[in-house]
């Protein structure tokens, strides 16, 4: 990327990007200290989970660059976007890490934000939202982008 060291603040954040820890490489303390620490932590992977902080009930979708979009409305509205099991996708982010995100426009219509992975009941097809449009993701593209079915 840019030669800097980025910190995953929580295991759940890491697992939104990778399915396991098999790609983590152990390096010496000397090597580690030679890599500049980035000024921000890694945020939840866009389109994979919904987030909230423990002290506020608002639920947010995450888009590129760690931008949060409040999913405005009631539970039925959230279900229309993310399915009946939408609450299982909500990850509590510790308040101290909430500053890693920035706030964008709220989601007020049943339109998925860019970067969201979408599947439909009864279909094996997978889509990603790009420029407001659904784009089918092939198996090769799914694997190459390290998408995960569980997210």
Where are the predicted features?
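Short, surface-exposed polybasic-aromatic patches that bind anionic ligands, especially phosphate groups
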Residues: 1-151
């Amino acid at each position: 990327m840019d030669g800097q060291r980025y910190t995953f603040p929580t295991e759940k954040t890491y697992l939104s990007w990778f399915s396991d820890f098999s790609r983590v490489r152990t390096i010496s303390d000397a090597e580690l200290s030679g890599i500049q620490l980035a000024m921000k932590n890694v945020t939840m992977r866009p389109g994979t989970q919904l987030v909230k902080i423990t002290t506020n009930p608002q639920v947010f979708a995450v888009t590129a660059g760690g931008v949060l979009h409040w999913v405005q409305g009631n539970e039925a509205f959230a279900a229309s976007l993310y399915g009946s099991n939408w609450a299982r996708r909500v990850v509590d982010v510790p308040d101290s890490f909430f500053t890693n995100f920035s706030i964008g426009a709220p989601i007020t219509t049943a339109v998925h934000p860019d970067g969201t992975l979408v599947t439909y009941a009864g279909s094996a097809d997978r889509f990603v939202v790009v420029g407001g449009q659904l784009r089918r993701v092939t198996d090769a593209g799914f694997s190459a982008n390290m998408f995960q079915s569980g997210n």
